[in-house]
């Protein structure tokens, strides 16, 4: 894996679905190294991951092996664009697609 998203745990779409279905808090970053907006958000999200106790998972939306599954996941949860920050817990899910989030905004969203 490249330096992009190195602070996150890579995960497959099928494993992400299993985590979403569990009651545990699950934090997922969907993005791609070639996306300029993802490149804007990723350093702040990485800092939050390093400074907090949260394990943030990552799906590279350019992964052609899982493209259909990624599109289905995005459609199901209304993830219109990347970068996307997705949080699920106890059957509830929320998503934000905003590359301008501050570290404080990110922490508020995932907490």
Describe the function of each predicted region.
Residues 42-45, 71-73, 100-101:
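Short, glycine/charged-enriched secondary-structure capping and boundary segments
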Residues 64-82:
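Short Fe-S-cluster ligation motifs
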Residues 34, 62-63, 99:
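Short beta->alpha junction loops/turns
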Residues 36-37, 65, 94:
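Glycine-/small-residue-rich active-site loops that bind phosphorylated ligands and cofactors
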Residues 81, 86-111:
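Non-catalytic, surface beta->alpha helical segment in thiol-disulfide oxidoreductase systems
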